[in-house]
From Swiss-Prot:
Record protein name field: 11.2 kDa protein
Naturally occurring in which organism (per UniProt): Pseudomonas phage Pf1
Highest taxon of the lineage: Viruses
Length: 103
């Protein structure tokens, strides 16, 4: 029984690196490791109602991956978002005067 579980898992990379937390699911009868952050799966404690049948009794796996440099478009978008968030944070710190809240 343990041998069948090991055949579904990828072989570990001898060089440790970046790892993604994945949920092992079955799609079209094949087990796949789907990253948790982008998978659209419900929370791990939620009932999986057959839409995402789990491949193993313990569905979580740390999958080896490699870092990919961000493209120029992604970096430009991050800069714009950072500037926007900085402006919003400054606007929240401005005193509005008048009302105070007693605690």
């Amino acid at each position: 029984m343990n041998h069948g579980r090991q055949s579904l898992l990828p072989t570990p990379n001898p060089r440790p690196g970046l790892r993604l937390l994945c949920v092992l699911v079955r799609k079209a009868g094949h087990p796949i490791a789907q990253p948790v952050a982008v998978s659209g799966l419900p929370a791990p404690w939620a009932a999986l109602s057959g839409r995402w049948p789990l491949a193993l009794p313990s569905p979580f796996l740390l999958r080896e991956t490699r870092p990919v440099p961000a493209s120029a478009e992604v970096l430009a978008r991050c800069v714009r978002q950072r500037e926007t968030h900085a402006l919003c944070a400054r606007a929240r710190r401005l005193p509005t005067g008048g009302l105070t809240h007693a605690r």
